[in-house]
């Protein structure tokens, strides 16, 4: 089923995955044009209150858009915005460079001769063609991998570098404090809500499953998104554009074979042009100051699971619980990733083994159970309500046999933390 979003946060469904229109623009279910000869894709409508524009879904040619790309992204003012802010003309806090024609530069490089007879320096003029156009800034090699993807043949010690595990953990603990989004940034957003962000995360999970992206890619994308929204005000009509640019950037960082830019344009039902997406990627990088290497909940959880070996089922259950924390800004953004990962480990361990936090991990992390208890309680309550959430992409993901159907396990109703 194709899923679309309305401005009130409800999920709208249609009969096809392809051609989802901008349901955020209209609370009613938007019309869908189906391209019968194309493979099915997961698409998401755009968040917005304005009248949605009629658009063609034809892949043959996308009509040019007149939107500048970032006109709905504003810098936060110095004070908290009121509930009904007065209309203010958008003022971008940075300069977006307009695409220029291809230019040719001549660079002189001094190359010494390799022969003994000719010791003179040879000057070569190398012409570099710098294509400053709308084309993708990178070329993706889509050839299949030659080696089979078998995690069982990977030596964990070779990957984790066990000799330096304490130094690595200490470095990640220090780095997580430097790249944290603001815990309550959503309260300062004038036009978007936590419910809209939740719907966006749900869609990004489906995108990750559609293109078989790594779990770490999703966590990185959410870090980029939350850090961007912590200091920039975004109108609902551009929220999906920022989210798409975030997962595009995370894919380039994490994946060996990331999807092409055109694929990300396609999954938005061509709501945004390729030029808009690349410009938003540029804006995202400037706001993040190119700080893309950040610790995530996933990284800490993998450390814990490797440090204190558990069953495969518990690994999947802990990963499921940790991924659920991506759905909500409050209360989980107020906890550092290492603490959230510890809470996911404790809850999964108690659900299956009736124990919380092993002594080995307490010594390794310095976290006592009393330190983890507040985050653990919040995560427990959220997991109890997960089956009744409108957004079910994460639960559906972990319902599969690949993850041993851990999302179907019944959570304990009470945790003996006192």
UniProtKB/Swiss-Prot annotation:
The keyword Cell cycle applies. Keywords: Cell cycle, Cell division, Cyclin, Mitosis, Nucleus. The keyword Nucleus applies. InterPro entries: Cyclin, Cyclin-A_N, Cyclin-like_dom, Cyclin-like_sf, Cyclin_C-dom, Cyclin_N, Cyclins_cyclin-box. GO terms for cellular component: cyclin A2-CDK2 complex; cytoplasm; microtubule organizing center; nucleus. It comes from the Eukaryota. One of its GO terms (molecular function) is cyclin-dependent protein serine/threonine kinase regulator activity. One of its GO terms (biological process) is G1/S transition of mitotic cell cycle. Pfam families: Cyclin_C, Cyclin_N, Cyclin_N2. It is found in: Nucleus. Belongs to the cyclin family. Cyclin AB subfamily. May be involved in the control of the cell cycle at the G1/S (start) and G2/M (mitosis) transitions. Interacts with the CDK1 and the CDK2 protein kinases to form a serine/threonine kinase holoenzyme complex. The cyclin subunit imparts substrate specificity to the complex. This is Cyclin-A1. It comes from Xenopus laevis (African clawed frog). The gene is ccna1.
